[in-house]
């Protein structure tokens, strides 16, 4: 079984979000599971530099100009690169310029990505062609449409990592992207009078997956579907929509082997976690005290992530004696709010604006509770890292958070399935009730340790996801 992942970023070469983590880990897990998985990416500068052994496979003149298809390897995974400097050789973000304006030629830059994905199924590389083209998010959404236009030379899977980003472009660009105008239709890629790359993926793919079972269910509901609910309800009825939970890359995220931690530990040596907490308290300017629970946030600071709720609930958390360490950037109003809290509560609140991958590991190793109060969360990786590190996740019951964290209710504790704290309602009061439960459990150290050990024993390895995808691919054949 030969599978081509079509996407725009891959950890650690280029990362703007969780999509990169998935592409950095899933193909390798699939190869270990017996699937011949390869990845197709635009040759953005950071990616081009990382794939050092790239050789020319093919050269083509396309609707988006001249391109060279390269093939090389990264960490044992075969990587195809679309080398088109006039489109991709730009510094910084792959999607927008330094002023945060989307590039005006994004329609061509990402239509080309989908086009090459479909061409691969028609023999662009004479020595390897995919049985399944697996496209990820709107950037690759046209791949299933180009396959449909070519009579479907391969099966297609489209994975939704976040339905909020829809890849919308003016209708007149149908003239530029080499798809029949008949595709510009409500039964096609048209959405609100524009081209939607996301809808192209949803409409033309043989199967749609979302990155968790709960998110797959939620996106059939109006409040999560951004106008796509009709199509997604239909795909659900046809059995063409399912959820496959993302995994954790254990080569990168494991407290037993994580060289970024001051002290490594396992579920049997949890006492060694304490040194990480001490170091984190020092680094964040917090009072060094192992008796108080240290809550943490590692997140984009946006209302989608529910960080306004944390700001509102913060006085209640601090009154009970807790500490907060925050790493993130985003909404200027939220940034100012957290910086003001750090100034008002020195020694209790530590804030670092920005994102540093290495420091996120130190927070995960040192904190007692990781807060993920998202309004919606397709899968969420932060809570999975928390479970892995014995840093109990406190989450809102939505998307992948609902699938992965079980509340420390009395019955869950009795049944041995408790792994964190879960709240229902989208408000600070509901969040504060969960924070209160965390303090109550904290006051019973042996019970806290019991829940940590349960959390760390859970299996969210990529092998599980790789097996689910393999079964899906074979069902499509």
From Swiss-Prot:
SUPFAM superfamilies: UDP-Glycosyltransferase/glycogen phosphorylase. It comes from the Bacteria. It catalyses: [(1->4)-alpha-D-glucosyl](n) + ADP-alpha-D-glucose = [(1->4)-alpha-D-glucosyl](n+1) + ADP + H(+). Its EC number is 2.4.1.21. InterPro entries: Glyco_trans_1, GS/SS, Starch_synth_cat_dom. One of its GO terms (molecular function) is alpha-1,4-glucan glucosyltransferase (ADP-glucose donor) activity. It holds the Pfam family Glyco_transf_5. ADP-alpha-D-glucose binds at residue 15. Keywords: Glycogen biosynthesis, Glycosyltransferase, Transferase. Pathway: Glycan biosynthesis; glycogen biosynthesis. GO terms for cellular component: cytosol. GO terms for biological process: glycogen biosynthetic process. PANTHER family: ALPHA AMYLASE DOMAIN-CONTAINING PROTEIN, GRANULE-BOUND STARCH SYNTHASE 1, CHLOROPLASTIC/AMYLOPLASTIC. Belongs to the glycosyltransferase 1 family. Bacterial/plant glycogen synthase subfamily. Synthesizes alpha-1,4-glucan chains using ADP-glucose. This is Glycogen synthase. It comes from Shigella sonnei (strain Ss046). The gene is glgA.
